[in-house]
Amino acid sequence: MNTSHKTLKTIAILGQPNVGKSSLFNRLARERIAITSDFAGTTRDINKRKIALNGHEVELLDTGGMAKDALLSKEIKALNLKAAQMSDLILYVVDGKSIPSDEDLKLFREVFKTNPNCFLVINKIDNDKEKERAYAFSSFGMPKSFNISVSHNRGISTLIDAILSALDLNQIIEQDLDADILESLENNAPKEEIKEEEIIQVGIIGRVNVGKSSLLNALTKKERSLVSSVAGTTIDPIDETILIGDQKICFVDTAGIRHRGKILGIEKYALERTQKALEKSHIALLVLDVSAPFVELDEKISSLADKHSLGIILILNKWDIRYAPYEEIMATLKRKFRFLEYAPIITTSCLKTHHIDEIKHKIIEVYECFSKRIPTSLLNSVINQATQKHPLPSDGGKLVKVYYATQFATKPPQISLIMNRPKALHFSYKRYLINTLRKEFNFLGTPLILNAKDKKSAQQN
């Protein structure tokens, strides 16, 4: 049956350059169509695509950035506003990591005036700690705003549900769609879409010349990454995907990080690219060269994994020529990397491919812990037992208690304690609870984020 008689609902994605419009377009389309880049203004034409949102066919428009000083800005702006006028719903995307400018607000109001059927989508809110940044956009006065992170796939399902509701598509049952539409959607869907979110993203980090590229080659059994005795032969992150059983793992070999100090030119570019690669990673393989003693820079680099809340595995490379006995190295490791005490340790010689299969299987094990969700009843049972065993210290003589606990996110696991006096939760008691949860539920190689909230804050979130 021909479907041309059906009028599709149209969604336009608008906003300034480099806020993540094309990335959101690709995420909703579940296919890499628009070119995404770190450079502002990459999309200059309107990309149009028929997509399926939870089985409902809609038309999605990705437009060029609307910055005042962008190339062909007048033409692009006119085209954007025309797309806004013709659309059933606008997703106006802003960068949650930036402070909104007067230009942001001016452009948004112009779009809203053209078509008030508009959602404010605050992108790059990568974790719960960054929600506070979204409050800066309250001046936009939008009751319908959504905190998302396209790169971390956070908040996307909530946004899709709201889109379907706004377009009155929630009540349409699948049987009402023409059979040929369903067949078309099924046939045109990229074959790897179903498992797209199951690809484990692994960043390989470490100092220059510790063996990161050799490790990548050993893991993938390819000479994809240039290996040389010359320090710093990898500049751009190099990625390679392998399959272990049914599980896809994408490795990114990042540029080696040199000594501290002023970094200019291509090294600055390499460091920025490394940071970008880690933003998209689930797990970091921290490669340490044990042919010589650890240095301060090793600790600095390890903090990158902590900064991005990644799962982590410590890879002790060049073990066959280690500088000291096993006991001495492990004692030094425990002392210098105390904050990574939950990370598994694997010794290897990448050039000789020792223990490479162990690394692969450990990645899957850590990712399972990284993605773990604890049933609420079980979580509260453990928290209750812990607080009974060691009661919470009082706050100036006033009782401090936990009403309940809830896990609100995974990758990494994030848990909220709903309390009567959240500010009274001392860091040492928080550490006690985290250690208790680790012992009970096995969060191998995984950061565990625990925060305290009062009932009012919990209800608002």
UniProtKB/Swiss-Prot annotation:
Chloroplast in keyword set: no
GO molecular function, one term: GTP binding
Positions that bind GTP 1: 15-22, 62-66, 123-126
Gene Ontology biological-process annotations: ribosome biogenesis
Amino acids binding GTP 2: 206-213, 253-257, 317-320
Ranges for domain KH-like: 372-456
Domain EngA-type G: 9-171, 200-371
SUPFAM superfamilies: P-loop containing nucleoside triphosphate hydrolases
Keyword annotations of the record: GTP-binding, Nucleotide-binding, Repeat, Ribosome biogenesis
InterPro entries listed in its UniProt record: G_ENGA (IPR031166), GTP-bd (IPR006073), GTPase_Der (IPR016484), KH_dom-like (IPR032859), KH_dom-like_a/b (IPR015946), P-loop_NTPase (IPR027417), Small_GTP-bd (IPR005225)
Assembly notes: Associates with the 50S ribosomal subunit.
Protein name: GTPase Der
Organism: Helicobacter pylori (strain Shi470)
Lineage, broadest ranks: Bacteria, Pseudomonadati, Campylobacterota, Epsilonproteobacteria, Campylobacterales
